[in-house]
Structures are given as C-alpha cells and as structure tokens.
Amino acid sequence: MAEHLMSDVPFWQSKTLDEMSDAEWESLCDGCGQCCLHKLMDEDTDEIYFTNVACRQLNIKTCQCRNYERRFEFEPDCIKLTRENLPTFEWLPMTCAYRLLAEGKDLPAWHPLLTGSKAAMHGERISVRHIAVKESEVIDWQDHILNKPDWAQ
C-alpha cells in the first residue's frame, strides 16, 4: 500500500534536482522562452538587462527552439542550464521551475506538468509569445531593454 502511495507523488516532489533523470530534468522546463531572450550586460557594473529580443532559433509562436538538439552549433552563446551551474543563474525568472524547486517551492498551477499543455502558461502571459521580437528586426538593442536602469527610465 505504501509503495502505491509513493508512486502517486510527482517526481518533482519526491526527488531532488540532482536525483532526477535527464528526461525528468528536461520536462521541468515549461517552455516559456524567457531563457531565449537576449540579455545585455553593463560593462561597468556587470548588471544584466533583459530584452524582448528573441534568439534566432526561437520560434516565437510556439516558444520552442527550432534546433534544440543542435542549438550550440547554431548559437554558440546559447546557455545550457545544468544541475551544476543552476546556482549561478540568478537571472532565471521567478516562475522558472528549476529556480522554484531549487528554492524548495512547488510548481505553479499553470505549469505544463500539472496542466498537460502550455495553454495555461500562455494564458497567464508567462511565455514570451506576447512580447518577443525577432533579432533580425532590431535596429537599436537598447530600445528593447525591459528592465531599464533608473537613469534610463
């Protein structure tokens, strides 16, 4: 009986991030696309500024990488989030499952692992579908900074 009850507990509640299989780890990604928006770094302060400019490999409508398996060939600067480097990514969105679980929190109600699809996430406007622009359309990157410093507001 106890064994049956254990199987009803979702893996993200019964395992640490380190204990998860690669498939479980990958499934935590809600596919919001926020990681795939370009970030700019202030050369003087190292502060990170978020833009609404999508990576060339991001399909803005689906919020999925066009070449996920080969993304590093197409985009050498693409960032690979791993169990080891997770603590160094302070910029991850507050809604990111990796961040939430690392902080001992649960997945949000709209997460695709709970709802079975990305529809609720898109409905909550968590994904970049509603704000992202194509890199090829950008003239002045600074016009696309979302979290401008006080002096630039």
UniProtKB/Swiss-Prot annotation:
Pfam families attached to this UniProt entry: CxxCxxCC
InterPro entries hit by this protein: Puta_zinc/iron-chelating_dom (IPR005358), UCP006173 (IPR008228)
Family to which the UniProt record says this protein belongs: Belongs to the UPF0260 family.
Protein name (Swiss-Prot/TrEMBL): UPF0260 protein YcgN
Annotated source species: Escherichia coli O139:H28 (strain E24377A / ETEC)
The encoding gene: ycgN
